[in-house]
Amino acid sequence: MTYKEYRDKVLNFIEEHEKWRSHTINLIASENITSPSVNRAVASGFMHKYAEGWPKQRYYQGCKYVDEVELIGVELFTKLFKSDYADLRPISGTNANQAVFFGLGQPGDKVIVLHTSHGGHISHMPFGAAGMRGLEVHTWPFDFESFNIDVDKAEKMIRELEPKIVMFGGSLFPFPHPVKELAPVAKEVGAFVVYDAAHVLGLIAGGEFQDPLREGADIMTASTHKTFPGPQGGVILYKKFADDETIAKLQWAIFPGVVSNHHLHHMAGKVITAAEMLEYGEAYAKQIVKNAKALAEALAEEGFKVIGEDQGYTKSHQVIVDVSDLHPAGGGWAAPLLEEAGIILNKNLLPWDPLEKVNEPSGLRIGVQEMTRVGMMEDEMREIAHFIKRVLIDKEDPKKVRKDVYYFRLEYQKVYYSFDYGLPMKE
């Protein structure tokens, strides 16, 4: 094969992927779809540019237009999240967490985070960014019944350990975390309160879920491509939470600590997404939560064991389903079958699963944010629940269901809650 043929093959795979993706029901909770305007930014000449440092204080020349875009971004993000500072330079949510761990922690300092099985992100773990910084990682006590941090036991843990950082947020995140209840206790022992908003940033922007910076968090870290429907990237939002020297340590941890050039085409895409969310974020976040509740209720009616029934199943974009009663391999069996039917989601550990079950966990994690953005509403969620039932409970041939999924998805090809297409119209 010639090198040009390799090129052609790659371009063909990209084209095939885009065609395939546009005809699937994508329920991956950590993905979304960007608007045409954001796509223009990401594909722009900003991808060729390098910039280090702050706007107007660069180490490279030729940043005149890049600086203006980034300054607009700081203005829009601080307005959207009512923060004192917004730093768009992290290139991922994990990268944002790295900056916090390196800026505010020293090797041997204690941090309290959510355990992976309970929904914590890998970057919070001893084998992730927290451990790589040399932090001593402790995990929140968890209440299986409420599917959340156990507040009483957590208060006791904070007072006993006197950690440097307490961290809320995670990857399995159907219900708000008790920031309001635990932040005052953390402040008593001098801990920084950090909230990883990667999954719920768009819901926070739209006034749904919870408002961490008003509830006591000092800092929010996040990725920008889940419920916040931008390009892949990260952001750090924070209040004037400490003296100037401490804040400077965080800023220096970002650059030159863990970021050099900050992928300016993605930065520009984040800025446009912030403008979209200021215009449409409230409607978008509201519909996401409505859709998640509708899907959860429909799945329960179809015979699935949906987690969190006593609390209304979910208050976020996520629906968590325990499928271990359908097959010994649980989510490891269900997710590939659903992919054959054109329904894309991921297997997931549930709080009672040991880490050894990572490939055959009990659960499925479902997110509705992308299908909401292409215009789907509660009625469509009920149809999706029935597609899932046909595959997993009725044991129908996934290829047969795939045909129905294909035609169902054909109607939903526009990216709403954007300046390109506005709001979806309910017929």
Swiss-Prot record:
<dbReference type="InterPro" id="IPR001085">
    <property type="entry name" value="Ser_HO-MeTrfase"/>
</dbReference>
<dbReference type="GO" id="GO:0004372">
    <property type="term" value="F:glycine hydroxymethyltransferase activity"/>
</dbReference>
<dbReference type="GO" id="GO:0005737">
    <property type="term" value="C:cytoplasm"/>
</dbReference>
<keyword id="KW-0963">Cytoplasm</keyword>
<feature type="site" description="Plays an important role in substrate specificity">
    <location>
        <position position="225"/>
    </location>
</feature>
<dbReference type="GO" id="GO:0035999">
    <property type="term" value="P:tetrahydrofolate interconversion"/>
</dbReference>
<comment type="similarity">
    <text>Belongs to the SHMT family.</text>
</comment>
<dbReference type="InterPro" id="IPR049943">
    <property type="entry name" value="Ser_HO-MeTrfase-like"/>
</dbReference>
<comment type="pathway">
    <text>Amino-acid biosynthesis; glycine biosynthesis; glycine from L-serine: step 1/1.</text>
</comment>
<dbReference type="GO" id="GO:0030170">
    <property type="term" value="F:pyridoxal phosphate binding"/>
</dbReference>
<feature type="modified residue" description="N6-(pyridoxal phosphate)lysine">
    <location>
        <position position="226"/>
    </location>
</feature>
<keyword id="KW-0808">Transferase</keyword>
<keyword id="KW-0554">One-carbon metabolism</keyword>
<dbReference type="InterPro" id="IPR039429">
    <property type="entry name" value="SHMT-like_dom"/>
</dbReference>
<dbReference type="InterPro" id="IPR015421">
    <property type="entry name" value="PyrdxlP-dep_Trfase_major"/>
</dbReference>
<dbReference type="InterPro" id="IPR015422">
    <property type="entry name" value="PyrdxlP-dep_Trfase_small"/>
</dbReference>
<dbReference type="Pfam" id="PF00464">
    <property type="entry name" value="SHMT"/>
</dbReference>
<dbReference type="InterPro" id="IPR019798">
    <property type="entry name" value="Ser_HO-MeTrfase_PLP_BS"/>
</dbReference>
<feature type="binding site">
    <location>
        <begin position="120"/>
        <end position="122"/>
    </location>
    <ligand>
        <name>(6S)-5,6,7,8-tetrahydrofolate</name>
    </ligand>
</feature>
<comment type="function">
    <text>Catalyzes the reversible interconversion of serine and glycine with a modified folate serving as the one-carbon carrier. Also exhibits a pteridine-independent aldolase activity toward beta-hydroxyamino acids, producing glycine and aldehydes, via a retro-aldol mechanism.</text>
</comment>
<dbReference type="InterPro" id="IPR015424">
    <property type="entry name" value="PyrdxlP-dep_Trfase"/>
</dbReference>
<protein>
    <recommendedName>
        <fullName>Serine hydroxymethyltransferase</fullName>
        <ecNumber>2.1.2.-</ecNumber>
    </recommendedName>
</protein>
<keyword id="KW-0663">Pyridoxal phosphate</keyword>
<keyword id="KW-0028">Amino-acid biosynthesis</keyword>
<dbReference type="GO" id="GO:0019264">
    <property type="term" value="P:glycine biosynthetic process from serine"/>
</dbReference>
<comment type="subunit">
    <text>Homodimer.</text>
</comment>
